[in-house]
């Protein structure tokens, strides 16, 4: 995903320039694995704490994988099934991509945020990989509730 946006000091929008490549594998049984993620990310005028930003970006990749594969709220008989943390599925550490490569570049533009809006491309990358590998196109998340097996 490449996101470009005109930015300046007076805007109220979150903005950043980034390019992200996701390498996704799907076993014949339908197990999805993010094998590698490569990120090039704008630092704006300056980056005060690169390690902090790097960890923020890594966390976002893992959390958006979680969104794509597991997160859902189920209503049964008028009640929420996942009504406590022990019933709400989240990703485990072994589901994290073993390789996340992050490179920063400086555009000299204003950087207005490093929040959780950076890598929604994880869901679409996994969805596209599912389609390319299995021939099945899903339009609803989480993908983990779908039959992802293929022959």
Which stretches of residues belong to each language-model region?
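Cofactor-binding beta-sheet edge motifs in enzyme active sites
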Residues: 1-151
